[in-house]
């Protein structure tokens, strides 16, 4: 008798436990279906589609997954979608009932059968559309960027300019003095000497890399369903010079931008200490602050990138990081008369970043030239600080550097992809 009575709560608890466990298992599967549905609406491919297409994808995914759950009644999901700028957020909510295997168990307590167990849940997923971006490329074409690009090239140039003390720089002078080109066959400048020797210079590789980058940008914008516009400038001692900026602004004609970039060349000077025949500038051929001030005036306030009319803005700088300007009042290094040779003054970088414009920096290492007396006197004392200084100019995560024998094309493309990824994550 006692044993028989004890079976009643045991049967009750066992039946309830089995029904609860069954419902919990089904709810786990429905939660997974909701997760899959929410994610289906924000895949990279679906982010390129309309809201209605994304809603349909989420609905179909949930229905297909939930259809495999037996002994349950699943109501159509409630799917909400919001788009705020580049951000899409999708929430999939569901209600369902699990059919109980022991509906009479509850009648011992409530006096009525309970044929189902209620279930509900939701899942949320968020993703980002690729932003539309205007890129402003500011490329250093001062004489120091015309150094031989490889270790072998540097050795070749030094060995063939021994009468000058060994010079790895292929300076481009239209009217060189005898001292400038001492020992060169025919009296040609070092630029022509490098060409005759088959020495590839860093600026040549930069031009090729910039041109190749336009092809990468075109392929990437097509894949992302975004618009990337380009403006290309060089800078030296006189500020910035336009290489490509139709109508004074970035252009979406990336093919034309690539063609223009392939023509980038080193600053041509008259002779040592002379920019032109009548402009004795003491070789002050790199003024970063003036260049930054100039490009800053060209860049409008950035948008959020959600439309081509409201693009984000990215300033892309390639340089070896050495200023060479007339500056007798605020030079951080010893002066040569009024000539200031120092690491870039990055105060304008702070100004630009403060406007919400991202800065990507490729530092092409200013290579030690121990056989060159000018380098040893004026550049060597601060050469080791250049990389840190250039990194301080860049936005977080948008700094890259290469040295001798480095692949400038790969470096620029890596930095470009980092800039795109960072632009998306900031929204």
Where does each model-flagged region fall?
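Von Willebrand factor A/integrin I-like adhesion domains
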Residues: 58, 62-72, 362-427
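Short beta-strand-loop
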Residues: 226-275, 329, 370-390
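Von Willebrand factor
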Residues: 38-42, 132-316, 323, 363-365, 403-411
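VWA/integrin I-like adhesion module and closely mimicked acidic/polar interface patches used
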Residues: 149-153, 158-171, 321-389
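Short amphipathic secondary-structure patches
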Residues: 38-98, 212-240, 294, 397, ...
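Alpha-helical assembly-interface signal, strongest on the long, hydrophobic N-terminal helix that forms
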Residues: 1-55, 153, 360, 394
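DG-centered beta-turn motif at the end of beta-strands
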Residues: 137-142, 206, 232-235, 295, ...
């Amino acid at each position: 008798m006692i044993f028989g009575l004890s079976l009643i709560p045991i049967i009750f608890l066992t039946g309830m436990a089995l029904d609860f466990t069954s419902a919990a298992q089904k709810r786990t599967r429905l939660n997974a279906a909701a997760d899959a549905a929410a994610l289906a609406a924000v895949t990279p491919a679906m982010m390129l589609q309309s809201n209605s297409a994304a809603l349909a994808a989420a609905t179909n995914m949930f229905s297909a997954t939930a259809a495999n759950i037996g002994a349950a009644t699943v109501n159509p999901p409630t799917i909400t979608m919001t788009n705020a700028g580049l951000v899409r957020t999708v929430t999939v909510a569901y209600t369902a009932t699990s059919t109980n295997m022991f509906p009479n168990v509850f009648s011992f307590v409530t006096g009525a059968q309970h044929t189902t167990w209620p279930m509900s849940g939701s899942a949320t997923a968020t993703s980002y559309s690729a932003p539309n971006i205007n890129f402003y490329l500011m490329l250093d074409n001062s004489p120091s960027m015309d150094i031989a690009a490889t270790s072998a090239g540097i050795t070749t140039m030094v060995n063939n300019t021994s009468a000058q003390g060994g010079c790895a720089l292929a300076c481009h002078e239209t009217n060189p003095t005898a001292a400038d080109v001492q020992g060169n066959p025919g009296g040609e400048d070092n630029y022509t000497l490098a060409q005759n020797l088959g020495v590839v210079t860093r600026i040549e590789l930069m031009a090729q890399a910039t041109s190749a980058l336009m092809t990468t940008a075109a392929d990437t914008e097509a894949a992302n369903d975004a618009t990337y516009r380009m403006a290309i400038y060089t800078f030296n001692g006189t500020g910035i010079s336009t290489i490509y900026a139709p109508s004074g602004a970035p252009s979406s004609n990336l093919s034309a931008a690539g063609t223009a970039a392939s023509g980038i060349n080193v600053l041509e000077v008259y002779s040592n200490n002379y920019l032109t025949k009548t402009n004795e500038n003491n070789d002050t051929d790199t003024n970063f602050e003036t260049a930054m001030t100039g490009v800053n005036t060209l860049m409008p306030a950035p948008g959020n990138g959600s439309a081509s009319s409201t693009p984000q803005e990215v300033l892309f700088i390639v340089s070896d990081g050495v200023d060479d300007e007339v500056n007798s009042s605020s030079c951080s290094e010893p002066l040569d008369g009024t000539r200031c040779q120092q690491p870039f003054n990055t105060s304008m970088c702070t100004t630009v970043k403060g406007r919400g414009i991202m800065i990507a920096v490729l530092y092409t290492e200013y290579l030690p030239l121990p056989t060159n007396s000018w380098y040893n006197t004026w550049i060597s004392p601060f050469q080791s600080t250049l990389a840190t200084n250039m990194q301080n100019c860049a936005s977080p995560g948008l700094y890259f550097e290469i040295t001798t024998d480095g692949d400038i094309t790969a470096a620029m493309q890596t930095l470009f992809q980092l800039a795109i990824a960072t632009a998306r994550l900031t929204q």
